[in-house]
Amino acid sequence: MKEENLKLAAANLGEGVTFKGLMSKKAHLKNGVAKEAKDIPGWDYVVKEAAGGVCYSYYAAQPPLIGMTRPVVIKCPLGVRAFDTYKIDFKEAINIFHKLDCGDAFTEMALYYVLYPGVNEPHWYIRSVTGCTVVIGADSGKVMDPVHRE
């Protein structure tokens, strides 16, 4: 899956600007909690510019909704790497989440590629209303052991 929003955001910054890749993607949830894909009206993106390595943050609505904010320069986040593609979209990640015994709703959903030895794909991180954090491989669909927090 390629993020089409990257092209739109780069176009907002001027001619010739391209982004190296996605650094993170965090869901905005209706009323702070979600059960399904329709409960996500948009996303906060952090992307890295190809030429200078500068990072930008912006919001983009989830289609069929429209709209996005102008990208603003931010400090690049530490501990994550840029990536261009992934196979498991957020709808499929939500379906995988519902197959687990971690509650029926979630309060956070994010996608990023942790810069850590042995991590070879980006991951979806979904925090359930029961306090369980589900980690799903964004290429493999593999579920890591859920992490329970109090």
Model region roles, listed by residue range:
Residues 1-150:
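Long, terminal "pre-/pro-" and other extracytoplasmic accessory regions
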